[in-house]
């Protein structure tokens, strides 16, 4: 089965990676591809700076679910509002729910309880794919926080289940932990760049997922790779014969960056034997055209 078809069978796809590697762009590209596979897809962003709409060519979400294409919607979530929404869902009496949310005890608990906000976001995604929410989807693509925080998010339900024990919150945490640990339901996509620090973080996250959750990611994406500069014949000194002499230094820098990419890809391959999608550097402005180009390149890699 091709990797894209395998991902399309999941109900939740969590995309994580070091900040600055193009994680949000890859999440948006995956959402677009899964929608093209016939799956009703919701893209979830939890960054308060809200940038997903720039790629999709829509208005900012502001917390609302916006249509972003055929079978594709997008939403920006604020973790605190999701926790409050969970209270309203579990406490059917509106006045009582409002009183609970306004209480100092709840405020302290919501801000300080380890893993609560992360679990609330994952629970929101689960209710959507289980058709228990007014917004419904076949698959949710979650643009998760950067690497370490992304791993903590995935581990949050299990940690919270151990901390709270029984009750509705404990039951919900255990249900979520089982859902995330099952690769039939939840897929993890790790985005990196073939540079020293991003690859090191990727290697550490792969190990962390195996240790904490007993499973590796489904897919690793190496983004923004410099193209092979061997299309020019000879060495840097020969480049000036074919191009403006001012390009020689640029071409040499290009060659060196490509060497770094190849070295780090070999290091990554030393610990990762699964699917590794390699995407080229695309010098384009952030927007729908960039998203279309990244989605096309990713689809080619996942055939």
Where are these regions (language model features)?
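Short, surface-exposed alpha-helical recognition segments that flank or form part
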Residues: 113-120, 193, 197, 256
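Conserved nucleotide-binding/hydrolysis micro-motifs of P-loop NTPases
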Residues: 48-51, 79-83, 146-148, 194-198, ...
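Nucleotide-state-sensitive switch-loop elements of NTP-binding domains
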Residues: 2-13, 21, 26, 31-141, ...
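C-terminal lobe/tail of nucleotide-utilizing enzymes
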Residues: 1-7, 181, 185, 196-303
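Residue-level recognition of beta-strand->loop/alpha-helix junctions
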Residues: 45, 76-78, 192, 221, ...
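P-loop (Walker A) phosphate-binding loop of NTP-binding proteins
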Residues: 18
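Structural beta-sheet core signal
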Residues: 43, 142, 188-190, 220, ...
